[in-house]
């Protein structure tokens, strides 16, 4: 799988290109008098060291780029790597089935759960089919239908957040985009089952919040959560999207910053270089966090669960 190196990773890309070149030469002619294995190993160690150095001092804008990485794991990738017996459920029973939201029943270590998440696409056709991960009102109404089903059957709800934002098209507005988001916020705040939310990529404004009200809210290390994109903020404040790096720093969109502000509960570490480098490793870390969160919530009765969730919402903004 291509790593699709970002701009700030170019020194790493150059080293990896040298490694690939030497490896290819070694495979083509095994009779070479020069032993390339030691040189390849040296370069690999240097690449790891350089990656560790670069990733130890990332800015908010660089993290935003990682959150949007084209090879980053999406909701369906985590479903495949963490859960078993997934059965997708479709449609909002009112208008259509929005492919930007996926959801269904699955098992987490044998325990039945309801999973709901944003889904982006990788190839052009899939991106269009998924509307680039931007749900329409019917997507949020589908999500709510599944949440209400989970409440009826006493299933914990697990959501995965990864969207640039709710779709802002005319049709979406005509079908009640803001109403759908607002209704989800209200209903999620009073569902009588545990809700664990995790930002796995972009957490874009109301489009993220519509499946983001929970008893536990986590973020992957290189994910972001914000009321507007850095480019959008820069365009408003500085009249230029070129100021996006400055806006990203000012907005405090990173997982560690939001943890400091008590907006989220946990930051889930990613493999060196980001989640796209090792799907299996990030799945193991995320699964462990989900199991720990559900264990914490299982000891609460319905009244305690709702009171705690209410207090959580009321405390937002107080550090």
Curated annotation (Swiss-Prot):
Subcellular location: Cytoplasm
GO molecular function: acetyl-CoA carboxylase activity; ATP binding; carboxyl- or carbamoyltransferase activity
Catalytic activity: N(6)-carboxybiotinyl-L-lysyl-[protein] + acetyl-CoA = N(6)-biotinyl-L-lysyl-[protein] + malonyl-CoA
Domain of life: Bacteria
EC number: 2.1.3.15
Pfam families: ACCA
Chief location category: cytoplasm
One GO biological process term: fatty acid biosynthetic process
CoA carboxyltransferase C-terminal domain location: 35-296
Pathway(s) annotated for this protein in UniProt: Lipid metabolism; malonyl-CoA biosynthesis; malonyl-CoA from acetyl-CoA: step 1/1
Family recorded in the similarity comment: Belongs to the AccA family.
Subunit structure: Acetyl-CoA carboxylase is a heterohexamer composed of biotin carboxyl carrier protein (AccB), biotin carboxylase (AccC) and two subunits each of ACCase subunit alpha (AccA) and ACCase subunit beta (AccD).
UniProt name for this protein: Acetyl-coenzyme A carboxylase carboxyl transferase subunit alpha
Species whose genome carries this gene: Yersinia pestis
Lineage start: Bacteria, Pseudomonadati, Pseudomonadota, Gammaproteobacteria, Enterobacterales
Gene: accA
